[in-house]
Amino acid sequence: MDFELEPTLESIVEHDSLKWIFVGGKGGVGKTTTSSSIAVQLALSKPNDQFLLISTDPAHNLSDAFCQKFGKDARPVEGLPNLSCMEIDPEAAMSDLQQQASQYNNDPSDPMKNIMNDMTGSIPGIDEALSFMEVLKHIKNQKASDGDSDEKTVAYKTIIFDTAPTGHTLRFLQLPATLEKLLGKFKQLSGKLGPMLNMLGGGQQQDIFEKMNEIQKNVSEVNEQFTNPDLTTFVCVCISEFLSLYETERMIQELVSYNMDVNSIVVNQLLFADNDGSCKRCASRWKMQQKYLDQMAELYEDYHVVKMPLLGTEVRGIDNLKKFSKFLLSPYDPEKDGSLVFDMEEK
């Protein structure tokens, strides 16, 4: 390229049409801090809009990051009312699904009742499926807010996902296309077997088929939105080490194969130890980090590569997140901003 892209996420924060922002990477690289920081900057820059940060990682950390308890329902962040957070709890959601399945009807001989119970049993990838159900719900809310619906729904301008480690995230992003094909086949099958199932199930199956049609439409819309760069983008998070860089490259290749927009990488935990001669370990580690930063500069010359400092304490609480997140928009300068490394409030 003839020019270097800004090493910031300013283009994402200022983007006016983004509906979905995914933040992902290897475990332990700072995904939650990064996703929380992006959400905070979005909320600060657009105070008249509502934003939602969802954790799809079974090991929820949003409550720890904001020092505030979150659950399966969206709750506003204290001190930043136009940002809400929620943590999807797969076990609780599975329990609800099984309860609904057991109450499907009171006829123990109904074959559909057993099918529903089996479907809500031990399903591989249930974390991803439940996360996707949450996406479908918000797609429905978008439609309700765009129309004349009387339902009290909150239409969030942008939804940010604090995702599970790479493997879970990639399975989650495959779901729309996979489900779209599966529902299409199920629709064909239901057309052939519908009359027989209605005889067996007392006519209740018609409701299921109607719901399947509605789900298929919503899934198709999600698939379209996820592959539209004006609506969806993915932010990769890594640290400047070999394994993390390797995982990032693998993830980017996968995302490109899904036709998803990805042009931003956040590199966390950098030491910036050029003038730290008193700490040999810091200097040695910074030298190693610089080696991988140089490799990233070659590999990702057409990406926004954001370099974030390693701090002296954890980034917890809304005040600390506000301080730290500003470096997503204005590059960290160790000469000017070095004091911030030890300036965070202990929580």
From Swiss-Prot:
Its main location: cytoplasm. One of its GO terms (biological process) is tail-anchored membrane protein insertion into ER membrane. Homodimer. Component of the Golgi to ER traffic (GET) complex, which is composed of GET1, GET2 and GET3. Within the complex, GET1 and GET2 form a heterotetramer which is stabilized by phosphatidylinositol binding and which binds to the GET3 homodimer. Interacts with the chloride channel protein GEF1. It comes from the Eukaryota. InterPro entries: Anion-transp_ATPase-like_dom, ATPase_ArsA/GET3, ATPase_ArsA/GET3_euk, P-loop_NTPase. Coiled coil: none annotated. Belongs to the arsA ATPase family. One of its GO terms (cellular component) is Golgi apparatus. It comes from Meyerozyma guilliermondii (strain ATCC 6260 / CBS 566 / DSM 6381 / JCM 1539 / NBRC 10279 / NRRL Y-324) (Yeast). The keyword tRNA-binding does not apply. The active site is at residue 57. Zn(2+) binds at residues 279, 282. This is ATPase GET3. The gene is GET3.
